């Protein structure tokens, strides 16, 4: 089972967005060959909240589009317990997603899907701190989005 806990701090999120993101992340989970039970949360926030989170936890006093908190980093694996794998939290700023969708000329739904997948890949350990890692992560993103059928059109 793959459980996604959605939280909307904006009161703007459409129920269909939850279904699209859940479907995309289930597809990505299969593409990444994660076979065990897993769970994560996706929270939608505004610019003020994401800036505060970014400042508090990343020491960056600016607005951003998505922040991920991987709960498995540096955590020992507990073997033998019948518990799902807790991947972490994805926080998406809906205001920035809307602006980026306009800027890139694609739908808001496509941008939300892209940001959710980007955050999901971070939870799995992908990163883009250097050029080589960026190529790997962004290539994986594009492969999954294209296979899923969520294009920039």
Curated annotation (Swiss-Prot):
Entry's cofactor comment: Binds 1 zinc ion.
Keywords, comma-separated and alphabetical: Cytoplasm, Endonuclease, Hydrolase, Metal-binding, Nuclease, Ribosome biogenesis, rRNA processing, Zinc
Subcellular location: Cytoplasm
InterPro entries given in the database record: MetalPrtase_cat_dom_sf_prd, YbeY, YbeY_CS
Record organism: Staphylococcus haemolyticus (strain JCSC1435)
Transmembrane intervals: none
Any Gene Ontology biological process: rRNA processing
Residues binding Zn(2+): 118, 122, 128
Keyword match rRNA processing: yes
PROSITE patterns: UPF0054
Keyword Nuclease (UniProt): yes
Protein name in UniProt: Endoribonuclease YbeY
Top EC group: hydrolase
Similarity section: Belongs to the endoribonuclease YbeY family.
Cited SUPFAM superfamilies: Metalloproteases ('zincins'), catalytic domain (SSF55486)
Record-linked Pfam families: YbeY
EC number: 3.1.-.-
Cofactor(s) in the UniProt record: Zn(2+)
């Amino acid at each position: 089972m793959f459980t996604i806990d959605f939280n909307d701090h904006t009161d703007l999120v459409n129920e269909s967005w939850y279904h699209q993101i859940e479907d995309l992340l289930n597809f990505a989970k299969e593409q990444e060959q994660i076979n065990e039970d897993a769970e994560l949360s996706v929270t939608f926030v505004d610019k003020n909240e994401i800036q505060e989170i970014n400042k508090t936890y990343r020491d960056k006093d600016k607005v951003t589009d998505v922040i991920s908190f991987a709960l498995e980093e540096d955590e020992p694996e507990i073997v033998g317990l019948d518990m799902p794998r807790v991947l972490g939290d994805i926080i998406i700023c809906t205001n920035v997603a809307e602006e980026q969708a306009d800027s890139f000329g694609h739908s808001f739904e496509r941008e939300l899907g892209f940001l959710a997948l980007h955050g999901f890949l971070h939870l799995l350990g992908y990163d883009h701190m250097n050029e080589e890692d960026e190529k790997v992560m962004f290539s994986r993103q594009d492969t999954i989005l294209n296979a899923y059928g969520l294009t920039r059109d």
